[in-house]
Amino acid sequence: MSGESTIRTAPRSGGGTSTGTARTGGGLGNRLSGIAVALGIVLFLGGFAWGAVVYRPYTVPTSSMTPTIDAGDRVLGQRIDGDQVRRGDVVVFHDTSWVTNADVVKRVVAVGGDTVACCTKGKLTVNGKAIDEPYLPAGSLAELQGFPTVTVPKGRLFLLGDERQGSLDSTAHLTDAAKGTVARSAVSARVDAVIWPMKGMLKRPTGFEALGSLSQPGPFRVIGFMIVAGGVLVLGGGAYGPVANLLDRSRSRGRTESAGAR
């Protein structure tokens, strides 16, 4: 092969290794990004689905539960059976002897077998025990006019609004056959949280603890965490690709400029 010359060019040290490493890193990063997005979608949609099964939203039209729940507030009620209701719960119920065409939101202060009266030193008493009610409006007393001692029949509930002076609650129905009480079976939900405006979960009614166990909070916080974490993973995983490509292009330009300067 006369007349021909062979010129061998040595590969640049480290060039192939750098490119291979970048490709390997990019592939791993893309896989992790895909996993993050998939997990995020599962958490996000799973949180919404769980919430739809467990909770039902309600809009409270009156101020009878102020300051716990104001008129127009949007709340989440955990779907429960009436036998799950405990003292201190804020519940949603329907009783046509109270309101014919709407649900009502009030606080349970006594259950079947309890004796409720008002007032001892300005406090509501249940089974002779004065109840500490920090959720009442500032400066408000629990004292109500024309509130005789009531023994709650089995299977029924005695309910009051937190804004005692203006609430049409059990005290407004004392002359009814049920003495102002409501059947447990009328309850459809227990209010866990106020979601609009975002006041968060209701405080536990610890003043009733001496009379028996309180209801356990629902999964509102867990569901909220799932939705938020899922959203973060979807956004973070989805943003990885464009950011990684931008960084790769920046590194490539840097290597090209460095090679041209040699």
Predicted features by range, described:
Residues 2-262:
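Extended hydrophobic leader/signal-anchor segments used for secretion and membrane insertion
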